[in-house]
Amino acid sequence: MYKAIRKAAATAALTMGAAFLAGPASAAGSPDSGIYAGDWLVRLRAIEIAPDARGSGTLGALGADVNNAIVPEVDFTYMATNNIGVELILGTSRNQVTSNIGALGGVGVLPPTLLLQYHFNNAGRVRPYVGAGINYTLFYNNGLHAGGQSVSIDNHSWGPALQFGIDFQVTKRIFVNADIKKIWMHTDASLGGTSLGTLHIDPLVVGLGVGMKF
């Protein structure tokens, strides 16, 4: 299922990109298309969170890794101008941590992300966009353990985020969306007061969904 979402998002992005490059017949505006200053865009996506995990210190020696997850995500974009938008992304997941000595348990991850976006071809039906911003990650419901002891972790981190996506308008208000984000996040871990090192999660987030313009 992970590969299916990635393949679907990649296919959608390529298809929409080809339509955009094809010219006026597919990408040009019409009275019922486009986004403009003051518009709100709300999207609901299915996303695959694919961590690029690596650990330092003991975590690195143990080969600590973080499993993929598929979850729903919702985001809200406000168009400050015809081309510039501000997006807030909301979603949460439960990720399992593994190591060379076996499963270490799971932890909840809540990573609200705020992005400044630039939307190309704002008056058209096919609208690529790019974004950059900041991510705050809250780690909660920590269920990590090793050797019969609980593993303590820092409960938050800050990091940058980058984004590329495409909206394809199908009616006056409804559009479909493909989106790829890279988010940097990490947490420090300890066991019995002894540092285990830092776990960098740094996921690639691939999503496919639908949206509505207000």
How should each PLM-predicted stretch be described?
Residues 54-60, 96-104, 140-150, 188-195:
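Outer-membrane beta-barrel translocator domains and adjoining extracellular loop/strand segments
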Residues 38, 68-72, 106-112, 126, ...:
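Residues that define the transmembrane beta-barrel architecture of outer-membrane proteins
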Residues 28, 46-50, 75-146, 203-214:
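Gram-negative (and chloroplast) outer-membrane scaffold detector with strong preference
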Residues 1-36:
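Cleavable N-terminal export/targeting peptides
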Residues 111-116, 131-136, 155-166, 180-182:
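Hydrophobic alpha-helical segments of small multi-pass membrane proteins
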Residues 23, 38, 82, 122-128, ...:
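Short coil turns and loop connectors of transmembrane beta-barrels in diderm outer membranes
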Residues 95, 171-214:
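Predominantly the C-terminal beta-signal and adjacent terminal strand-loop region
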Residues 25-76, 141, 211-213:
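Short glycine/proline- and aromatic-enriched beta-strand/turn motifs that initiate or cap beta-hairpins
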